[in-house]
Amino acid sequence: CLIILTSCGGGGSSNSSETNPNGSDQDINLSTEICSNTNRDRLLKCDLKHDNRDRFYYVYAPGNLDSNESIPVLFALHGYGSSALTHLNYTNYFPIADTNNFIVVYPQGATTATLSSHWNVGGWTSKSTVKDIEFIDTIINLLKAKIQIDETRLYSSGMSNGGYMSYHLICNLSERFAAIASVTGSMTDGTYDNCSPLHPMPVLQIHGLQDFVVPYIGNSGSKSIPDVIDYWVNYNSCKLEPNQLIKYSNNFDLVIFDTYENCLNNVNVKLILHPEMDHTWPTLQEYGVSASNEIWNFVSQYDLYGFIE
């Protein structure tokens, strides 16, 4: 059954399976996944068993979806201790997806005895044994089995721990993802020191100087934001001096937009730095910056091969 049209149950899927073309040889058995309607139009909740854990994710399909065309997918990852539904509500991606014709996936992080709902990114989550890279990879394969997704245009975005996870994904699953965006996230030492992307990677970081949860200057559990930006600027062989744009926010604060250009495959690395923003997802009304719009406008420029001409 098509995930964009109706709810999917195990009984209707028989024993359909798919082998992961990226080499993990992971069998995807649709009969182990049950997708059901929610109280929101075109939003399904999909439950599955992964690594002996009960996991789930939400998937939103735009109203104008053309089932004959491949469609991009944006993963939206919540922060530590939060939930997929909470993230869904404050990111408000639905109207953007409707206008631009892409699918949004909201996975739910796992909870363990020592950690609240989280994404396993090493570092400060090192007590976790949850296989989140494989979980995201499995979701991609499950989507592929149900709908014609554009596998060259898979993107990840996230808030805080979800931003860390977006970086973790492109360091460990770069054959899947074309671009990412992090809001108030960073990279753990483990992610930073063991990062091996297979292609130039567009990266957007949105951060506030008043964020003391994930400080701009870094701490024992996080790289500083300048270190993160420098990593990707150097990895992508970008011009070292950014093209800088300064805008006034609603409170007449100066918001800095640094775009590093002339990178391999014509990708960019971008930092949006707000002097008054704390650990939050900025909106146009409150901070003069819409993270959700900035994210889609940035990532949608790229596929796995770089800038889309």
Segments predicted by a language model, with ranges:
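Short beta-strand/loop motif that positions the catalytic acidic residue
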Residues: 205-207, 211
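A domain-start/cap signature at the N-terminus of enzymes
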Residues: 8-73, 85-88, 128, 154-181, ...
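Alpha/beta-hydrolase
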Residues: 75-77, 183, 274
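Conserved alpha/beta-hydrolase "acid-adjacent" motif
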Residues: 212-224
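Short, proline-enriched alpha-helix->beta-strand connector loops that line the catalytic pocket
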Residues: 198-203, 265-269
